[in-house]
Amino acid sequence: NDTRKVLEIGPGMGALSKYLWEIPEIDLWLLDVDIESIDYLRANYPAHADRILFGDFLRLDPKELFGEDAFIVVGNFPYNISSQILFKCLEYRNQVPQIMGMFQKEVAVRVAQKPGSKEYGIISVLLQTFYDIHYCFTVDEHVFIPPPKVKSGVIRCVRNERDALPCDEKLYFQVVKVA
């Protein structure tokens, strides 16, 4: 798609950011709750300091940052809040045409599962209602220092053509969550 704005959530020390900044076609913004990471990134990438923001994506109103503009969400998402990040993206789905991120493998697999599989659940149903999901690849824990106790999985979620549901959306979400 033609979306230029990209929001990286939880950039840490910029392992992904440094490559994203090399892509001239995108307008990259970084958001992190760790002030040490923010200070490090601002000190090491001063040309981008005004787009390195301290804040919590779960508390952010994206309209304050991007207005009505669309933005792509990327990141090596903190595993303890990755599902909440996806639900927040779902809430702003009309502005978020794409999500690309690394998750704990079990979460990534669950999000990408098809109906009928045992992992198919609430997050699968709700995200797949509005996004086409592709499980890209698994990342072994040994590529990280220190290595986590779990594997990671990268998924790509691309907004589908569904703008509205043929039923009350709030009721749909409630029914899926209790089913």
Where are these regions (language model features)?
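Catalytic cores of RNA-modifying enzymes
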Residues: N1-V178
